[in-house]
């Protein structure tokens, strides 16, 4: 089980300056030394490098685009197999109701339970309906990761209306809820923990210096 506390997302896509499994392992080490209780990471290669560097539970994902589908976070059994090989403690996958490129969500959950019975599963959702569906399927954790990042939730931010969407999710499911997406300040982190989430994933506000720099620059341009 993931501990209560701060999970730091250590990810850099191929077009980003810090794209490197070695760099992500050092980012994870910095997060560990700062008090993080877990890491969220993308790709088998990054996860293996991170697990060689820090003794923290890892939420693993594989981001891969597929034609004719907007689902890209651990979309098929191919990505699941890569994550099983990485020996991450938790596999996270897109649990939205969008069209998937291959297996159904139900089939993927069954696949993970069969092939990796000791690995926990996290649902990345965008709506309360999707959270309820994930709970029905028996996900161990339900994360607000994709709220604001789907075509039908675009423009919505997790912290709007004092985290009302997060409150709605917490009231709708019995599973452990993870706050993720637009938790961008220590005060926001404290607020979501006070609301009763199991843990919170923070990424860009900690591990994406390019984006952090842009925020400083843009404040003078606005």
UniProtKB/Swiss-Prot annotation:
NCBIfam families: PRK01130.1. It comes from Staphylococcus aureus (strain NCTC 8325 / PS 47). Belongs to the NanE family. Keywords: Carbohydrate metabolism, Isomerase. Pfam families: NanE. GO terms for molecular function: N-acylglucosamine-6-phosphate 2-epimerase activity. CDD domains: NanE. It comes from the Bacteria. Its EC number is 5.1.3.9. Pathway: Amino-sugar metabolism; N-acetylneuraminate degradation; D-fructose 6-phosphate from N-acetylneuraminate: step 3/5. Converts N-acetylmannosamine-6-phosphate (ManNAc-6-P) to N-acetylglucosamine-6-phosphate (GlcNAc-6-P). GO terms for cellular component: cytosol. The keyword Isomerase applies. It catalyses: an N-acyl-D-glucosamine 6-phosphate = an N-acyl-D-mannosamine 6-phosphate. This is Putative N-acetylmannosamine-6-phosphate 2-epimerase. One of its GO terms (biological process) is carbohydrate metabolic process. InterPro entries: Aldolase_TIM (IPR013785), NanE (IPR007260), RibuloseP-bd_barrel (IPR011060).
């Amino acid at each position: 089980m993931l501990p209560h506390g701060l999970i730091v997302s250590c990810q850099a896509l191929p077009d980003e300056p810090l794209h490197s499994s070695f760099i992500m392992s050092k980012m994870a080490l910095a997060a560990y030394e700062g008090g993080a209780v877990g890491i969220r990471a993308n790709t088998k290669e990054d996860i293996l490098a991170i697990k060689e560097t820090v003794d923290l539970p890892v939420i693993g994902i594989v981001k891969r685009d597929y034609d004719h589908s907007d689902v890209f976070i651990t979309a098929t059994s191919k990505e699941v197999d890569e994550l099983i090989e990485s020996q991450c403690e938790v596999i996270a996958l897109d649990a939205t109701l969008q069209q998937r490129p291959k297996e159904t969500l139900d089939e993927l959950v069954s696949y993970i339970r069969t092939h990796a019975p000791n690995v926990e599963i996290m649902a990345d959702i965008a709506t309360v309906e999707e959270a309820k569906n994930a709970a029905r399927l028996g996900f161990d954790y339900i994360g607000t990761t994709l709220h604001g990042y789907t075509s039908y939730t675009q423009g919505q931010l997790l912290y709007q209306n004092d985290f009302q969407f997060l409150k709605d999710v917490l009231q709708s499911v019995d599973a452990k809820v993870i706050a993720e997406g637009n938790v961008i300040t220590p005060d926001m982190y404290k607020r979501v923990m006070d609301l009763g989430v199991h843990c919170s994933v923070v990424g860009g506000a900690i591990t994406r210096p390019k984006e952090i720099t842009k925020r400083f620059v843009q404040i003078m341009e606005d």
